[in-house]
Every structure is written in C-alpha cells, then in structure tokens.
Amino acid sequence: FAISSAALPAPAEDTAVGNESETAPRPEGALPHVPPGFAVSVFADGLTHARYLDVMPNGDVLVAELKAGKITVLRDEGGTGHATKRFVFAAGLARPHGIEFHDGFVYVGDTKAVWRYRWNPQDGTAGPAEQVTSNDALGHYAGGHVTRNLAFAPDGRHFYVSIGSENNIEEDPQPFATIKEFDAKGGPGRIFATGLRNPVGIRFYPGSDKLFAVVNERDGLGDGLVPDYLTSVADGGFYGWPYSYIGKNKQPGPLGDKRPELVAKAIVPDLLFQPHSAPLGLEFYEGTQFPAEYRGDAFVSLHGSWNSSVPTGYKVVRVHFKDGKPGGGYENFLTGFWIDGSNPAKVWGRPVGLATAKDGSLLIADDVGQRVWQVRWVGTR
C-alpha cells in the first residue's frame, strides 16, 4: 500500500458516515493470518479491554486493561508460549494506556497523570504509586481521546507523552493534540510538538534520538480523507490539526483561514495510511527471532474504521525502513479479524498495543477478543 501526499482527493465537507464495526464471536479454531513461515497463537485471553503492552527484564508481560483501570502481569512460567500466571500489578488508575519500564520503575500514563511504580525483580510486584507529572500537566480530561502513551529518550534524561485532542475538528487548548516532553523526574513538562490530532503510539527509532508517532487524523471529509500517518516528530514541529492536513491542505471552512502562519509551516508526515484506519500501536522490531530483514522495520496496528462507508483496517502492518526513514509504503502482516469483507465490518478482534517479547516474538493486544496474541517465526532461514 502506498498513498501519496500529492494525490489526495478533494474534501467532501461535512461528510460523516457512522459505520461502526460489529463484534462477532471468534470462529471455532480461527487464528489471524500471518505471512508464510510465521505462526500465531494465543498468549493470554479473558482480559478486560486489553490495550497497551510492555515487557519486563524477566520476560513478564504487562498489559493495560483500560476499562478495568489496572495493569496486569502475564507470566509464562515454563516457556510454554502461554501466560500460565497472572496478577494485578497496579489498580485504581483512570483509563491507563501507556506503559514504559525505565531504570527500575514501571511508568504508566492515564488521563490524570504519569505514575511510576518501583518494580520488584524478585517477584514482579509493584511498589507504591508515585505521581510523576504535575497536576493537569496532561490536560484536565473532560472527554475526547483517552490514550496517554510514553516513550523514554535513549539517554534516559527525558520522556515523552502523546496527548490526543478533545474533539474531531475544533480548536483545543494545549496540551491537547500535542506531544509533551518531561524531565525524567517529572514536573510540568513542555510542549514538544503540536498539530497532532490524536498521536497514540510513540517510539524512538533504534540507535537514534529520532522520535516517531502514529497519528489518527480527523473525520468528516469523506472516505478518502484524511489519511492517518506515521511520522518522525520534530521539536517545535507543527503537523496541521485543526487548520490544515497533510501539510498545507487547508481545512474547509473558516478554520482553514484562521492561522495562516501555522499552515505555512505545517509538516508533511513521512508515511500515510488509508484514511480512518486508526493506527494505535507502534513497535520497531529489534529482536532476532524473526528473519534479519525485519530488524529496524516498524509494525503498526490499525485498529479499524468507524467513519468510512467502506470499512478499513483491523490488522497489523509492516512498514519498511531504510536509513532510519520509512520508505516503500506498507504491507499486511497480520490480518483475518474482519470476516469476509462484511459491511458493516463484523470483527472478532481489533489490534492495539504491540511489544517484542523477551524471546523476540511479537505480542499483539486485542481489545475486542480480549486477548494477547503471539507471533513467532517457525520457518527456515
């Protein structure tokens, strides 16, 4: 798949199509489809709105169960390929999403703040919750996008938090629709980049100080607009929302003429996804379990559309990288949740968070099937 920023269709102003997917039971014995040489299995099931993942130094998998307000530990005690033990790591959170292990602590982002918990390497349990960011540093949440995801800079001196907008296409007060930078010790932070309607997954490219984000763009301009995207994020960069999209393409109506000085410097993203695909998870593959050609490439979960007359997404895709930049479009990696191209889409899974397990396999959270899937290479090299 390749979408050119120079060949976008004309906007269909005020065209919104409510076309929510419908949850279907998983067909008996059904598994997602993966490329030849790979195998997929259930690592854990019976979860409550499984969203984001992180992997601890001992191999424990932490999963954010958003609607349950908790972080759960999933442990494969005997190398079985399945979580044989689970327990609550942290509870009482306000829609937790991002999880990041750093320097002996597990950092968690929810709609109130970033919190951290001392990780006990002996048994994998958590110490008391410590609030890291200042009150309202992530905005006073009153509705809108709930995801607050985290990424530590490679030098460990700062961490970054993605904060989505409160609405589809209106001006929001900061820090909504931004990525913020915080000192490792926390505090109020500063605005790092703006004009990002709903940045969700954020990750640093391996071996670099370059931050990347996947972003959910606006709805209401027709099936063909606006492409969601993957982009590197520049300090001080402006990415269009709400005044323009994909660079200097002005939002129809008065909003597009309101801040010409910002539109003039709007950055074109690096790689575009099919509009309304809803990219949520981002993982750069650094393991060795997959063939060598996968190292340095990105996996992106496309959660799937709700605002397109023709459904799209509900899959995980691979983005090829060369010299630290995405190139050549993207390709399917894990599909099959969407039953027979139905419309409205009948789905038995929707992928969200991605993480590389300690053994190098790929873990995928599924907030419809309430599972964590595991993909591993079983072919010859």
Annotated model-derived regions:
Residues 2-34, 147, 165-168, 174-177, ...:
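Beta-propeller domain segments
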Residues 42-47, 87-93, 132-142, 191-195, ...:
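Surface loop/turn motifs at the tips and blade-to-blade linkers of beta-strand repeat domains
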Residues 46-49, 57, 67, 85, ...:
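Beta-rich catalytic cores
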Residues 53, 99, 150, 199-202, ...:
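Hydrophobic core register within WD40 beta-propeller blades
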Residues 55-59, 100-104, 152-156, 205-208, ...:
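Residue-level detector of Asp-centered blade-edge/turn motifs that repeat once per structural unit
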Residues 60-64, 105-108, 158-162, 210-214, ...:
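Conserved beta-propeller blade signature
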Residues 85-86, 95, 100-102, 112-155, ...:
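Asp-box/WD-like beta-propeller blade repeats and closely related beta-sheet repeat scaffolds
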Residues 355-381:
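Blade-level signature of beta-propeller repeat domains, shared across WD40, Kelch, NHL, RCC1
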